[in-house]
Amino acid sequence: MDLATTNDAAGAGNDFDTARITGDIDALAAKHAGHEDVFRAAVSRLLKAELAKVRDAAQAKLLRDRHGRRCAERLCFIQDEIIRLSFSAATRHLYHSPIPSDGERMAVVATGGYGRGLMAPESDIDLLFILPYKQTAWGEQVAEAILYCLWDMGLNVGHATRSVNESIRQARRDMTVRTGILETRFLAGDRALYDELVTRFDTEVVQGTAAEFVTAKLAEREERHRRAGQSRYLVEPNVKDGKGGLRDLHTLFWIAKYVYRVHESRELLGCGVFDVREYRTFRRCADFLWSVRCNLHFATGRAEERLSFDLQREIAVRLGYTSHPGMQDVERFMKHYFLTAKDVGDLTAILCAKLEDQQAKPAPVLGRMMSRRRPGTELRRVPEGDDFIIDNNRINLAAPDVFKRDPVNLIRVFRLAQKNNLAFHPDALRTVTRSRRLINAQLRENPEANRLFMEILTSNDAETVLRRMNETGVLGHFIRAFGKIVSMMQFNMYHHYTVDEHLLRCIGILQDIERGGNDELALASELMRKIHPEHRPVIYITTLLHDIAKGRPEDHSIAGARVARRLCPRLGFNASDTELIAWLIEQHLTMSKVAQSRDLSDRKTIENFAAVVQSVEQMKLLTILTTADIRGVGPGVWNGWKAQLLRTLYYETEPVLTGGFSEVNRVQRIAEAQAEFRAAFTEWSEPELNAYIARHYPAYWLKVDLAHKIRHARFLRASEQGGRKLNINVGFDEARGVTELTIFAADHPWLLSIIAGACASAGANIVDAQIYTTTDGQALDTIAISREYDRDEDEGRRAARIGEIIEQVIDGRLRLPDVVARRAAGKTRLRPFVVEPKVIVNNQWSDRHTVIEVSGLDRPGLLFQLTAAISKLNLNIASAHVATFGERARDVFYVTDLLGARITAPTRQAAIKRALIHLLANGGAAEQSVG
C-alpha cells in the first residue's frame, strides 16, 4: 500500500465500527451455536448490510469533496475490515484451534490492485492465502469460510492458496504473479509467513531482474493500449486500461517500485525519478482518475471502466462541471480528462527516459518508447545550432540557459531535431516544458521563430514534431488559438479524437497524400502535384487550422477564418494567400456536404458548387483539405464511396469553372470508368459486358467505386438466374463497422420507404444509402446498416430477416407501421445527445426538383418515418441522399408534387417544414399506407 495516503483512509473508521460489529458477530455465534451454516449466512448478511451503509457514506463524501483517491482509500479500508472480521469469525467461531500446530497457520494477503491500498466500488478483490509448507485441512477450511462469506455478500473475489515456496517458484516464471506479489499487503493471520514471502521475494525474485521486469511491463502496456485503442485521445476512453489511464500510472509505480525499491509514491522524489512539480502532477492525475473511476462504478452499479457517451454527462455533473459559452459541461469535463491523460503519458516518458540513461532495460524496447535511439555516446554540436549538442543521437542543451538567452531556441530546437533526425534527450524536453512561458507576444511576432515554425510544418515528419511541440505545450503557447483546443472533445459520436489530435492526424494524412501511392487518396495525391508551388504552405497551414475555432459560441468555420486572418500574416503569408487560407477554412465542410447530400447528376448542384469554389485552383485545394479532414475523423469514416463522390463532384465542376474545358471531360470519364470495369471484370463475354454496361445510367458509372461495380454485376446475374422478385446480397465492411445490403427488385414508388421500414423493424440503423435505377426499370439500392453482431453469420441472419420483411410488405402480407413502432423506442446510446431538428425546403439547389434537407437526432426507423411522411404529403421522391455523422442524421430528398412540378407555394413549403420538424422533434412514426 502507498503509505503516504493511509491517513485519510483511517477516517473511514468513523463510518465503520469494527468493535461493535465484532460484538454483533460474537452474539450471532452464541445464538446459532451448533448451526454453522446458519451462522455463516447470518454473518454474511450482517457484513453485507454494514458494507452497504459505509459505501453509501463513501459515495456521499465523494460527491461532496470530489477526492477520488480518498474515496478509493476509504473503500479499501472498509474492505480490509470486512476481511479481517470474516477471518476472525472463521478462526474464532468456526474452526477455532486453541493451541495451533505449525500446520495451522495462515496469512491473508491483499494482492494486485487491492494490494495497492486503493479500491473502486465494484473492483475485484484479489486475495492470497499463504499457508505453511506442511498443511492441514484447517487452512483450506478457513480460506473457504472467508471466500464463501465474501461471495455471499455479492463481492467479486479472485484468490490463490499457496505456500511461500510455491509463490516464489511461480513468481519467477509468471510475470502476472510477480506483479501481484510486488503489490501485497498483510491483512490478517500469521505475520511471520507474510514477512518470509516479502523477504524471499526481494532476494530470490527481484534482485537482478529489473531489466526483465521493465521490458515485460512495457510490452504489456503496449498490448493493452492496442486492445483499448492506441490514442489517448479516443473520445470514449477506458479509464482503467486506456492510454493515459490508471493502469499506466500503476505500471509507472510498479516499475519504480521494482527498479528503485520504493514503497511509497513520495519516494519517487528521493530517487530522482520526479521533481516536486512532477510528483504533484502524479498525485493530481491519480486523484482525478480515481474520482472518475469511483463515480463510474457508483453511477452504474457495476465495474464499468469505459467513459461512454451515455455516462459522460452524468459523471461531469457528479464532478461539478458546468456549461460555459461554446462548451458544454461534459466537454469541459472531457477536456480535463484528456489533459490528465496527456500528463500521465508525459510522466511515463520521464520514467522511461531515466531508465534509459541508467541502461536499466534493453535498447530495442526503449527505442520503441523513446524513438530512434541508435548506438553511440559521442557529444558534438548540432549542425547550425551552437546552443545544442547531440548526446547519444538525441538533441540536448549545450547550456541550461539557452532558452532564456534566446527564446527563439524554443522553436529552433524542434526544427533542428527534425532536420537532423534526432530524438529528444529527456533533460531537453523537461527544460522545454518548463520554459514554455518564455513564449510571449514578442516571440510570437519574431520573423525567425515564425519562419522556423513554417519549416517544421512543411517538412518531413511534421506530424511527429508538431505532436512533440503539443506535448510540451510549446505549440499551444506559440499559436494561442491552438492552445484553446488542446484536449478539447466534441460531444458527438462522429469525431473519434480530440480536436488537437484530429488536426495533427490531418497533417500526417496530408503528408501521406503528398507522398502518393495510396489508391484511396489517389485524387488528392494527383491534385497535390498540380497545385501552384506557392500554395503548398497554404494547404499545410489550412489543414492545421481548419478546426482551430471549435468550442466557440459561433460557427467554427467563420470564427476559424477570422483566426487565420489574424495569424497568417505573422507566419509570412501575403494578403492574397491569407485570404485564400481564410476562405478554405470557411468552406472546409462545403465539398463534403455537397458530395454526400446532393444529386451530383443535377446540373444545378454543379453550378452552385462552382459558384462557391470560383476557380479550379481553389477547388483543388478544397478537395485536398476535404480528403484529409474526412480521413482524419477516425477509422472507417473515409471509404471508397466517399472518395468516388468527391472525384465525381470535382470532375463534374471542372468544366463549369473552365468554360467547358476539363482535363477529363464527362463523356471521357464515363468511358474510362466503363473501360476500368471491363478490364477488372473478365468473367463475361464481350456481348454480355456490352449489354450489362448499357443497363446503367451515366451517374452510376461516375459515382460507384470499382469494387461495388464488380459486386453488383455478379449479384444481378445471380439474381436473374434465380428468378426471384426480390434479391438481397450481403457484404461486410469491417473498417466502417457496417453491413451492406444490396437490394435488386422491380422499381416501386414506395421501395425506399419499405426498405427503411424493414431495417427499422429488424432493429437495424441505416447510416448511408446509394440508390440507383437501371435503364430497364429495376431498382439497385445499397443500404449500409450499423453492425450489431460480432459474427458475420449473425449479421447475415439479420439481413435475411430484413429481406423477408421487404418481401412480405411488397406482397401485402405485412403492415410496416405496426412492426416499426415496436422497435423505434429509441437507442439508449443516442439518448445523451441533443440535435436541434432542422428542415430546409429549397428550390435553388435544383432546376427540376424541390430539395428537402432534413437534419436531426438519428434513431431507429427515422428514414422510414421521413419517407412515409413525405409520401403522405403527396410528394414523389426522385432521389434520396442518406448520411449519418455519429448521432446526427442528414437526409436529403429531391421531390416533386404528384404532377412532377416543384413545390413553389410558400404555404405548402411551410406545411412540409412543420410536418417534418414535428416528426423529428417528437420521434413518432408517421401514419401511412405502406403494407
From Swiss-Prot:
Protein species of origin: Nitrobacter hamburgensis (strain DSM 10229 / NCIMB 13809 / X14)
Alphabetized Pfam families for the sequence: ACT, GlnD_UR_UTase, HD, NTP_transf_2
Domain comment, as recorded: Has four distinct domains: an N-terminal nucleotidyltransferase (NT) domain responsible for UTase activity, a central HD domain that encodes UR activity, and two C-terminal ACT domains that seem to have a role in glutamine sensing.
Activation and inhibition: Uridylyltransferase (UTase) activity is inhibited by glutamine, while glutamine activates uridylyl-removing (UR) activity.
UniProt keyword annotation of Transcription regulation present: no
Biological process (GO), any one: regulation of nitrogen utilization
Family annotation (SMART domains): HDc
Protein's UniProt name: Bifunctional uridylyltransferase/uridylyl-removing enzyme
InterPro entries in the record: ACT-like_dom_sf, ACT_dom, HD/PDEase_dom, HD_domain, NT_sf, PII_UdlTrfase/GS_AdlTrfase, Polymerase_NTP_transf_dom, UTase/UR
